[in-house]
Regions:
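Active-site donor/metal-binding and catalytic loop motifs
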Residues: 115-129
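Catalytic core of nucleotide-sugar-dependent glycosyltransferases
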Residues: 52-57, 132-152, 216-220, 251-255
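Acidic donor-binding loop at a coil-to-helix junction in glycosyltransferase catalytic cores
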Residues: 94-100
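Membrane-embedded multi-pass helical conduit in multi-pass membrane proteins
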Residues: 170-255
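Catalytic donor-sugar/metal-binding loop of nucleotide-sugar-dependent glycosyltransferases
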Residues: 101-119
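Short aromatic/hydrophobic "clamp" motif used to bind/position activated sugar donors
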Residues: 2
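Acidic donor-binding/catalytic loop of UDP-sugar-dependent glycosyltransferases
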Residues: 5-22
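Long helical/loop segments within the catalytic core of UDP-sugar-dependent glycosyltransferases
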Residues: 18-92, 135, 142-146
Length: 255
């Protein structure tokens, strides 16, 4: 099998041993646990750390335990040789890891998850570099939507499996939520313009939207850090700024 890493990664001493266990269990494509080398450098690296810790537990582990498919996540993963041999690594979007995962899901092939195969990835310190990186990811995700919505829809109709449906939800799920948010904000504005709402009412409605937007990500992050035994005290500044990190991603999606 091949194991894929970024050049700046630090690989846990037991990574290959734990991946080999998965290989011996019949898994052919397995994502390892993506941890962070520099989570406490500043609020940006802390944001990345919390994001990946959340993905590890709430996306990859949760889906794997439910019999669904995790996703390849850029680095720290294994692909068995006979998966690559027939046609090589054939992708055409900027998020080739997600694309490769979706192609496997369309074929009904479940990806594996190895929580004890750990790789430590370094994150950018500057906001400008982070903005460029996440813009690239967003463009790649949009490319995947254009390229794989139809094949996934066909797979859902033909195979009628929850794994195919989950893959379709992954690439399309954020769109309805985004549209719903815009609709709700628009309704509030129209009611205000039509004098059906006072300025105080408008302010209170905005607060109702914004407070959960700030509190829930922090609360969720703290719960995940507690479950994964991550040190919370050195991450307090990053936790406080985490909603801003996620909010900047929303601006990137608008771009």
């Amino acid at each position: 099998a091949f194991c894929i890493f970024d050049a700046d990664n630090i690989v846990d001493v037991n990574f290959l041993k734990n991946m080999n266990k998965k290989l011996c269990q019949g898994e052919d494509v397995v994502q390892g646990y993506r941890d962070i080398k520099n989570p406490t450098d500043n609020w940006i690296t802390a944001g990345y750390a919390i994001f990946y810790w959340t993905m590890n537990r709430m996306y990859h582990l949760a889906r794997y335990n439910l019999g669904l498919s995790p996703l390849i996540n850029g680095t720290g993963f294994m692909v068995r040789f006979d998966v690559i041999k027939p046609e090589g690594w054939v992708t055409k979007t900027l998020t080739e890891d997600i694309e490769f995962s979706l192609k496997r899901i369309i074929k009904g092939k479940r990806l594996g998850w190895a929580v004890d195969a750990i790789v430590y990835d370094e994150q950018p310190l500057g906001f400008k570099q982070s903005w460029k990186q996440r813009t690239r990811w967003t463009v790649g995700h949009i490319q995947c939507i254009k390229e794989y919505t139809k094949p996934l829809t066909v797979a859902v109709k033909e195979n009628k499996t929850l794994m195919n449906f989950d893959g379709l939800l992954y690439i399309l799920g954020s769109i309805p939520m985004f549209i719903l948010t815009l609709v709700l904000l628009g309704i509030n504005f129209l009611i205000y313009v039509g004098n059906g709402m006072t300025e105080l009412d408008l302010l209170m409605n905005c607060v109702r939207y914004l407070v959960p937007t700030f509190i829930l990500p922090i609360a969720t992050a703290m719960l995940i850090m507690w479950l994964d035994k991550k040190p919370i005290k050195p991450m307090l500044k990053g936790l406080a700024c985490y909603p801003l990190f996620l909010g900047s991603w929303l601006l990137i999606n608008f771009k």
